[in-house]
Each structure stands twice: as C-alpha cells, then as structure tokens.
Amino acid sequence: NAIKDPVEKHTHVTITFTQGGQLRFVDPRTFGEMFLATPDEITSEIEELSSLGVDPVETPMSWVDFGHLLRSKSQSLKAFLTDQSMIAGIGNIYADEILFDSGLRFDRETGSLTTQEIRRLYRSLVEILHEAIKYNGSTLSDGQYVDLFGKAGDYQSHHQVYNRDKQPCRRCRRNDIVKTKVASRSTFYCEVCQV
C-alpha cells in the first residue's frame, strides 16, 4: 500500500518501509498470526510451519505418492484435503471445487477410493489450484483475499459449487447445488455429480 492509502478495517499490523510504501496485515477473521524470524529459525520458531504437509504447487508429487499420502490416514475426503499437515494451502473453497471437479463426495472415506478415483482426485487438485492461481484466487463478496497490491482475484466467477447453493449444477443441470455443514464449515456439492 502507499502510505497515503486509507487504513482498512481489521488492519492489525502496519510496516512502513524507508523507501516508501507499507505492508499491512489485514485479518478480519483473526485466523492469522505474524512472526519475526530469520530464515534459519523459521521452522523452529514457528512450530506450525514445521508440521505443514506437502505444497502441491511448489513441490509436485506423483499421483502414486499422493495415493500413499491419501491412504495413510482414515478420514473423509474433505477433512483430508483441508488437513494442513497432509497438504498445505487447501482451504474450504478449493476443497469443494476439487471434489466437485473429481466427481467425489466430501464425506467419502480416503480408503474407499479406487485407483482411478485417486488419479482423478489428484488431477483435479493440481488443475484447480493452478487455475485458481491463474485467476489470482477467489475474492468473495466480503472483499477478503486480495493480493499484496490489493487487487481482487477472479476465480470466484469460475466456482462450480462453492457459494452456489440452490443454483443449478453447471455439469448435470438436473440438480441444484446443496449446502451443508461439516465440522462447522459450509460444504457445497451436487448430489448427482458427486459419488
């Protein structure tokens, strides 16, 4: 931000640079934390970083390795995708989009997938994340999730299920998207297209 830019609501920390500009930590939901550490200290000082799982964008893996990871813990597919100790960086929005794209329900158990379904889930995971990055992520109606320059993303206009409850499924056109609660989080899916 430029120093003259108005300070947004929920700005918790502002760092002003000597050569101009500011870095602002804006956290409306107060999920975030800020730490100061050297590169060598970062994982020892910030315990959460040492337990992060694989980053599927920065460190691609084979679908076979993904399958081993998937089967290493018995849980629902949505819980697996959003478990940061397994795969880093996938939140609620992208978990729903990945599951829809792969044709799999959120409540399927990790151990129930066939080899073909594992390959499909992995392909969807990679493709959805890269597509979301291409469109600068998802900026929802509350204006959250913008880039470092305050520019909104546009992937939300490509959402197939997330935040589209009671709207027709874009794939089957026979059913409306359903919204349910799972672990206190909204989950969106198509009862026809996802098995």
Each language-model region and where it sits:
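Structured catalytic/nucleic-acid-binding cores of DNA maintenance enzymes
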Residues: N1-V195
